[in-house]
């Protein structure tokens, strides 16, 4: 009948690629994307949430498998997931059995990640791969979204890795080795 949904591509269903046509017309949209490119078909494109766990284990980016951060074998979890803080990951000093974790050198490292994310974010924005919703915001903590479009694979992979770091929100603290590798990979892919 008239209200019956018609999928132009039955094999993928309503997965973003399909054309849902509830009018009964036979309208068709064809995306002719060369094999050298990837089509971004959602403003929610990117790694699925759980990025802190993925970063922790060194997975999720285009350089899998990464390196599991050795500090995770004890210290961080002891302080951040102790019985007093519940599952909030807010540090409670009473849990802490380790010293020197959040020294000025750690903050300097995180500031460096932040600075690199600004340069990378601006390059991806200029390539129309992402968009920063608030022009007064920043690319590390701002409201950043992927843009619809056909992107060459290097730009797409750079965007994906950028989103892994962005959604982790730790500026590298969850796995410095892996985040450095992702940043270096992104810069190489974008030529910056």
Where are these regions (language model features)?
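C-type cytochrome heme-c attachment and multiheme electron-transfer modules
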Residues: 1-192
């Amino acid at each position: 009948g008239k209200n019956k949904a018609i999928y132009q591509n039955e094999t993928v269903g309503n997965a973003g690629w399909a054309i849902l046509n509830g009018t009964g017309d036979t309208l068709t949209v064809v995306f002719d994307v060369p094999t050298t490119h990837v089509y971004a078909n959602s403003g929610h494109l990117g790694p699925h949430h759980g990025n802190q766990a993925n970063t922790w284990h060194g997975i999720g980016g285009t350089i899998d498998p990464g390196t599991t951060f050795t500090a995770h074998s004890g210290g961080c979890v002891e302080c951040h997931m102790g019985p007093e803080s519940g599952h909030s990951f807010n540090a409670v000093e009473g849990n802490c059995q380790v010293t020197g974790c959040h020294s000025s050198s750690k903050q300097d490292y995180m500031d460096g990640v932040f600075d690199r994310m600004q340069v990378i974010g601006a390059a991806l924005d200029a390539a129309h791969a992402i968009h920063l919703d608030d022009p007064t915001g920043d690319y590390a903590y701002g409201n950043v979204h992927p843009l619809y479009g056909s992107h060459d694979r290097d730009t797409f992979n750079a965007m994906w890795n950028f989103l892994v770091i962005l959604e982790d929100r730790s500026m590298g603290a969850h796995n410095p080795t892996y985040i450095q590798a992702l940043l270096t990979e992104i810069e190489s892919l974008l030529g910056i």
